[in-house]
Curated annotation (Swiss-Prot):
Entry's EC annotation: 1.14.11.-
Gene name of this polypeptide: Asphd2
Compartments where found: Membrane
Function, in words: May function as 2-oxoglutarate-dependent dioxygenase.
Protein name, entry field: Aspartate beta-hydroxylase domain-containing protein 2
Cofactor needs: Fe cation
Length: 343
């Protein structure tokens, strides 16, 4: 009936008037159920338009930029006190999940969706995972679901790399001591970075910073650099991978903070570990030992401090990020792609 009426209808003002009159009469003739149904459909349509409008793509957000920050004094930080609007620890980026999902789709198109279930789930429900995590563990960029959780890992979690690092303890220590001779009271030697702390001084000498090699520093420590290339589980191709020498001066306290992800294990090889130095992860304190590796999940709330005297000298560790042992090979490849530096 309606189809015949539309075909026969004259496209004119008179026809428009007749159309409106017919529509009003049709509504009057309808029973209450039909009117309610139409009203519900109209509400659903309006809600859908609003929802689609809210999810229009945000401006491009580089994953790498979310991990970087500079404080008010221009000192690179990476943990706290950063005031950069691009720092993930200081601001929330609504566009990040969309960017990650786009990267995952691009990876799956090139390779395969096989084995991507946890990553897909993690990206899709990232906001819920991060907001529902207990306050003791809150990775600030990416949470991979269904990974075993513990503040500290046993040494055999990455046995090969731990043993290799410990066998090369003396070589790394010698290269550090050669570097440290350049320190003076008035200037920071080239290649070193100072990090913001509420008290004391914290310096790092980067070999890999957020997945990017630092060639000038690597050339100064060739044996340490070659050692990094021999590690089987070193994260070197995405923004969650770092390797450096970390120095805490006496009297230094690092503010409690969370790392960006739970897909990695942070490994500290003790180079110089005077008394009064401690690492606290998830409320559990541990002490470093020279020539020994300490493995922990830095997505837990953690801090470090050096309460020794000036005569004790600095606390020095060689730090490197290793893959969490329960992240599968296919997932590692995909995460390297999704979180590639500069992507």
């Amino acid at each position: 009936m309606w189809l015949e009426w539309l075909v026969a209808w004259s496209w004119s003002l008179d026809g428009l008037r007749d159309c409106i009159a017919t529509g009003i009469q049709s509504v009057r003739d309808c029973d209450g159920t039909a009117v309610i149904t139409v009203a519900c459909l109209l509400v659903l349509f309006v809600w859908y338009c609003y929802h689609v409008g809210r999810e229009q793509p945000r401006p491009h957000v580089s994953v790498n930029s979310l991990l970087q920050g500079v404080d008010a004094n221009g000192l690179q930080n990476g943990s706290m006190y950063c005031q950069s609007p691009e720092c993930v620890r200081c601001t929330h980026h609504d566009g990040l999940n969309q960017k990650l999902y786009h990267n995952l789709q691009e990876y799956a198109k090139r390779y395969s969706w096989s084995g991507m279930g946890r990553i897909h789930k993690g990206i899709r429900e990232q906001g819920r995972y991060l907001s529902s995590q207990p306050s003791i563990q809150k990775p600030e960029v990416f949470f991979l679901p269904d990974l075993p959780t513990t503040p500290y890992f046993p040494r055999d979690a990455q046995k090969h790399d731990v043993e290799l690092l410990e066998r090369n303890f003396q070589a790394i220590l010698c290269e550090f001591e050669a570097l440290y001779k350049a320190f003076s009271n008035c200037s920071l030697p080239q290649g070193w970075k100072v990090n913001s702390t509420p008290s004391g001084e914290w310096f790092t000498f980067d070999f890999v910073s957020q997945g990017v090699c630092v060639p000038r520093n690597c050339r100064k420590c060739p044996r340490t650099y070659r050692l990094l290339g021999s590690l089987r589980t070193c994260i070197g191709n995405n923004v969650f991978g770092n390797a450096c020498i970390s120095v805490l001066s006496p009297g230094t306290v690092i503010t409690e903070h969370y790392g960006p992800t739970n897909i990695r294990i942070r490994c500290h090889l003790g180079l110089k570990t005077p008394n009064g130095c401690e690492l606290v992860v998830g409320g559990e304190p541990q002490c470093w030992a020279e020539g020994r590796c300490l493995l922990f999940d830095d997505s837990f709330l953690h801090t470090s401090f050096h309460e020794g005297s000036a005569e004790d000298g600095p606390r020095v560790v060689f730090m490197v990020d290793l893959w969490h042992p329960n992240v599968a090979a296919a997932e590692r490849q995909a995460l390297d792609f999704i979180f590639a530096p500069g992507r």
